[in-house]
Regions:
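Extramembrane terminal tails and long inter-domain/linker segments of multi-pass membrane proteins
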Residues: 1-44, 147-161, 191-227, 300, ...
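Transmembrane-helix bundle segments that line or gate the permeation/cavity pathway
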Residues: 2-23, 64-74, 79-82, 89-219, ...
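Long, contiguous internal "core" modules enriched in hydrophobic/ aromatic residues
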Residues: 34, 38-65, 154-354, 450
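C-terminal TM-helix exit segments that contain a strictly Trp-centered aromatic cap at the helix terminus
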Residues: 59-65, 133-144, 319-326, 387-398
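Hydrophobic alpha-helical transmembrane segments
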Residues: 93-101, 353-362, 428-429
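Extracellular/periplasmic helix-loop-helix junctions in multi-pass membrane proteins
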Residues: 256-260, 332, 370-371, 396-416
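Extended C-terminal subregions enriched in glycine
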Residues: 349-374
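Central hydrophobic cores of alpha-helical transmembrane segments
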Residues: 376-386
């Protein structure tokens, strides 16, 4: 039943199918639910989970040491007061955008190819936002006072500075996380009921039963589910654009050369979707191989995601060219120097590496043979993730290191604690993700069933 990636099953139109033929409602349900309920935990789950757990311990150690010693353990100093922490914050927030785009925008556009990938993409969004939220809190120096960011009654009658984009970040990211969590949970409810009905373990049955909230599959339940899904999709859709736009305001309202640019909002949004789809591919390709899901996550899914990655990559490439052109055309010596410093300054290798990763290498995606080659696609996705991290690093560190006054110039070098904190959040992300795929259906059971020919309805009569 599994699809051969070198010879994918096609429909008469010549396009690969969204689900391999031969499946029934029962076989789809059995295949996905068995990963959680009946299969023994495989070795290929334990090994990466233990690695992720080790990296999580590194993160906890780094955070504990930071709380004791302060942010001075990082490499930040005047003039580079934003280092890896804010770089990682922007990078993780960007990764989460693909999950919201897949689950919300593609739902509103009635794109059925989302059905096999939206569940774990939404989980990816939540875990990425959780990792992103760590860095601004730790960067405060006194993270236990984070509630000062929120307007609350206090004896001093002091309120946050609502004209600061850092405050906008708090509300944008918290709203994004809340809506994404609600959307993810609402989509899980029908499948949680399926696991409840199939679970043999009493505790598992009780847990899934509580989470399913009394779902019985009645027509009224489905009607309310559809209404809630569309409402949440409508709420989440503008968040795809607004969250990274607000994050870009952290830079655009500043007068730092290389930051004060109107191109940043669309540039940041495109880059977020670019890196987000790269992460979805990094997760989808091993998952379909390890769990034998090639018949549910087909080459058509991978090809479509590669096309989205190519399209957003072209927008990012245009932004790079336009950014350099505006610096030259403006005639502003500080803007021209900022761009020249990126290309030839002490951080020039970083800049040219990001140009290769984000602009040059992904052009191979124009060829279908590359888009449908699993190994190339996986390498390309890792390349984009690296390139987008380097882009944030160049924007933040390189711009701050040399601004207006040469006597104030300084250089940033990360410490072992910068590295430990960043690598630790990668461990946190995969720790949560591996727990998710072991305890929840990573693919939406009921939505994949709608892709079957048996689910089609003609003139009001089900086939």
């Amino acid at each position: 039943m599994a699809e051969d990636p070198r010879n994918p099953v096609t429909v008469p139109s010549g396009r690969p199918t969204l689900i391999a033929p031969g499946h029934t409602f029962g076989s789809v349900t059995d295949k996905i639910s068995s990963i959680v309920l009946t299969r023994r935990t495989p070795l290929f789950w334990f090994v990466p989970f233990l690695i992720a757990s080790g990296l999580l311990m590194v993160f906890l150690t780094a955070v504990a040491y930071l709380l004791v010693r302060g942010v001075g353990i990082w490499g930040i100093k005047v003039p580079v007061m934003w280092g890896w922490a804010i770089t990682n914050f922007v990078w993780w927030i960007g990764i989460g955008h693909a999950g919201t785009l897949i689950s919300a925008i593609l739902l509103l556009l009635r794109q059925s190819w989302r059905n096999s990938i939206n569940r774990f993409a939404e989980a990816m969004t939540l875990f990425a936002v959780a990792c992103a939220g760590m860095f601004p809190l730790l960067h405060l120096g006194r993270p236990w006072l984070f509630y000062w960011f929120f307007p609350y009654p206090n004896s001093m009658n002091i309120q946050p500075q609502f004209r600061s984009p850092l405050i906008w970040d708090v509300f944008a990211v918290s709203t994004y996380a809340t809506v994404s969590a609600l959307f993810w949970f609402v989509g899980l409810i029908p499948d949680l009921a399926t696991l409840r009905d199939r679970a043999r373990n009493r505790w598992a049955r009780a847990t899934y039963g509580i989470l399913a909230m009394g779902w019985r599959g009645a027509a009224s339940h489905w009607q309310k589910y559809e209404t809630a899904s569309l409402l949440l999709a409508g709420l989440a859709t503008p968040l795809v654009l607004s969250v990274h736009t607000v994050v870009s305001f952290d830079f655009t309202i500043a007068i730092v050369p290389g930051w004060h640019s109107t191109i940043f909002p669309p540039y940041f949004v495109a880059g977020a979707i670019y890196s987000g789809f790269a992460m979805v591919l990094v997760l989808a390709i091993p998952l379909r191989a390890m769990y034998g899901l090639e018949d549910l996550i087909t080459m058509r899914h991978l090809d479509n995601m590669a096309k989205v990655m190519l399209a957003t990559g072209e927008i990012v490439a245009y932004s790079y060219v336009f950014e350099a052109f505006i610096a030259w055309y403006s005639g502003n010596p500080f803007e021209m120097f900022a761009m020249w410093n990126r290309m030839t300054g002490p951080y020039a290798p970083t800049y040219w590496l990001l140009i290769f990763c984000n602009l040059v290498f992904p052009q191979l995606l124009w060829w279908k043979k590359i888009r449908t080659n699993i190994v190339w696609l996986f390498v390309m996705s890792l390349d984009v993730l690296l390139g987008m991290w380097l882009e944030r690093y160049v924007i933040i560190v390189v711009s701050l290191s040399r601004d207006y006054v040469p006597s104030a110039w300084g250089y940033y070098w990360p410490t072992i604690w910068d590295v430990a904190t960043y690598v630790g959040t990668i461990g946190l992300f995969f720790f949560l993700f591996f727990l998710f795929i072991r305890s929840m259906p990573m693919i939406s059971i009921f939505e994949v069933r709608t892709l079957l020919p048996q689910a089609e309805v003609t003139e009001g009569v089900e086939k």
